Amino acid sequence: MAQEDYYKVLGVDRDASDQEISKAYRKLAKKYHPDLNHEPGAEEKYKQVNEAYEVLHDKQKRAQYDQFGSAGVNGQGGFGGAGQGFGGAGFDTSGFGDFGDIFGDIFGQGARQQRVDPTQPQRGQDLDYTLTIDFMDAINGKKTQVSYTRDETCETCGGNGCEKGTHPITCDKCHGTGVMTVTQQSMLGMIRRQTTCDKCNGRGVIIEHPCKTCGGKGTVERKNTIEVDIPAGIDNGQQLRYQGQGEAGRNGGPYGDLYISYRIKPSKDFERRGQNIYTEVPISFAQATLGDEITVKTVHGDAKLTIPAGTQPNKKFTLRGQGVPYLRGNGNGDQITTVNIVIPKHINDKQKEDLTNFVHDGGGNITPQEKGFFERLKDKLSGE
């Protein structure tokens, strides 16, 4: 829109005051904002309005524009993602209270920050804790103790932070709200922003005679130990909530919660995938050929596994119900056991003869391996 007249875009005269320019901008910004106006061309018009305002509300840019036109401010216009809504334009509305301008008009009461009475009971903060447990404890469950530090209500003052016989007084700077309202000039006009009161630090009250035990905080840091009942079947990374085991609340508010994340040590014998357990077990060539009944380890103890005759390498067998318990009951997962057939590296002459006959009886043939240089030399020296 380099050829567009910025004054015409905003609908103001060339001698318009800053207040008139800001007023015109707010009106047009609300009219063409893409979150509110979905008509074709509205977004482009919104960008033009922002580009015009970006130049005309700045005295230096406006003077350059009046003298040289758009060439005088080339590359300085634009609004940096204005078509993305107010969040995309770089505004953080979380720190604003009563806007009293474009934000309040567009979004209504929803754009106003909800004030919380700092003197009312407030729930304590939640805490996070990581508990590392053994593999088998995760399978079978276990009771254990967990110790950690947390802020607890001061027993001396009962949590109000004051010496016995005294009481907090309302902050005379924020009048008990815990926040101060600051008015600032912006491209959108005057915006009121709320900040934490620097006199009472957001508490809304002043403690003239602080408790000697807690120093006026109302809480003291202490070690807390609880008994944790680890449920059978807990998985790696799962998190459980323990109600009321977090930080102390303020002004008599309830304690927060403790969230324990479980980290499970690996096992050298078992691999867990969900509710199933995976293992490997070696068997001999004879067991695979003739069949056998073997004993295998499971997470619940030893179990019998029947190896049928003619079992092939890497055959998988499923042991029903020998896996991980489901947290909500309803039985267990399975154990999948893979058999690895172990080929002997050394056999005696009798075993070699028996195997050769076995192959010949089956119609097969074995080609003897050619002797190496050192074996031939050894035979020659020995007269063979």
Curated annotation (Swiss-Prot):
Residue ranges crossing the lipid bilayer per the database entry: none
Annotated S-S bridges: none
Record localization: Cytoplasm
InterPro entries in the record: DnaJ, DnaJ_C, DnaJ_domain, DnaJ_domain_CS, HSP40/DnaJ_pept-bd, HSP_DnaJ_Cys-rich_dom, HSP_DnaJ_Cys-rich_dom_sf, J_dom_sf
Domain spans labelled J: 5-69
Any GO MF annotation of the entry: ATP binding
First and last residues of every CXXCXGXG motif repeat: 154-161, 171-178, 197-204, 211-218
GO CC entries: cytoplasm
Binding site for Zn(2+) 2: 171, 174, 197, 200
Domain notes: The J domain is necessary and sufficient to stimulate DnaK ATPase activity. Zinc center 1 plays an important role in the autonomous, DnaK-independent chaperone activity of DnaJ. Zinc center 2 is essential for interaction with DnaK and for DnaJ activity.
Function noted in UniProt: Participates actively in the response to hyperosmotic and heat shock by preventing the aggregation of stress-denatured proteins and by disaggregating proteins, also in an autonomous, DnaK-independent fashion. Unfolded proteins bind initially to DnaJ; upon interaction with the DnaJ-bound protein, DnaK hydrolyzes its bound ATP, resulting in the formation of a stable complex. GrpE releases ADP from DnaK; ATP binding to DnaK triggers the release of the substrate protein, thus completing the reaction cycle.
Protein name according to UniProt: Chaperone protein DnaJ
Primary gene name: dnaJ
